[in-house]
């Protein structure tokens, strides 16, 4: 996990690759249990960037556990953020290859912090239709909410100070899996 700190002072390694896999398997089981009566209407939407590979991993777990193909989409929330600083934002584009109307959509992200990303994701998702329900799955919940948002599925709660940051690395985006806390 040498690269995960991105040159910052690593205070703690909180999840290894094996622990991330175990957390995602547990989240996958919890999603199946909670939505057992409507699995055919289930869909996953990863929030760019690291939420997308996490959503694909959860879909892969569900396929292995139940033989069920759950559709996966990618959601770009750039234009829905409330913290744009006036510069031209880099829009990567969403790709949701299914109708969201009437579905139970599980939004997937790597870290839940203030809740602003989740709020922006809900706004972006609701522009595409009216889901029957929206649920939120996160690998890490670090607290410090500014909005009344709570994750339905959490891999690990990691209390942090405001001077610290949580860095998630995934093989698909960073070349290795791991979660570290960096900062003062």
Swiss-Prot record:
Per the Swiss-Prot or TrEMBL annotation, the motif PRPP-binding is positioned at 105-117
In terms of superkingdom, the source organism counts as Bacteria
Indicate yes or no for the key word Transmembrane helix.
no
Q: What keywords were assigned to this record?
A: Glycosyltransferase, Transcription, Transcription regulation, Transferase
Q: What is its EC number?
A: 2.4.2.9
Q: Which GO terms describe its biological process?
A: regulation of DNA-templated transcription
- SUPFAM superfamilies, per the entry: PRTase-like
Which Pfam families does the record match to this protein?
Answer: Pribosyltran
This entry's Gene Ontology molecular function terms read: uracil phosphoribosyltransferase activity
Top-level EC class, please?
transferase
Instruction: From the UniProt record, list the reaction(s) this protein catalyses.
Output: UMP + diphosphate = 5-phospho-alpha-D-ribose 1-diphosphate + uracil
Cite the HAMAP family for this sequence: PyrR
Which family is annotated?
Answer: Belongs to the purine/pyrimidine phosphoribosyltransferase family. PyrR subfamily.
Function according to Swiss-Prot or TrEMBL: Regulates the transcription of the pyrimidine nucleotide (pyr) operon in response to exogenous pyrimidines. Also displays a weak uracil phosphoribosyltransferase activity which is not physiologically significant.
The name of this protein is Bifunctional protein PyrR
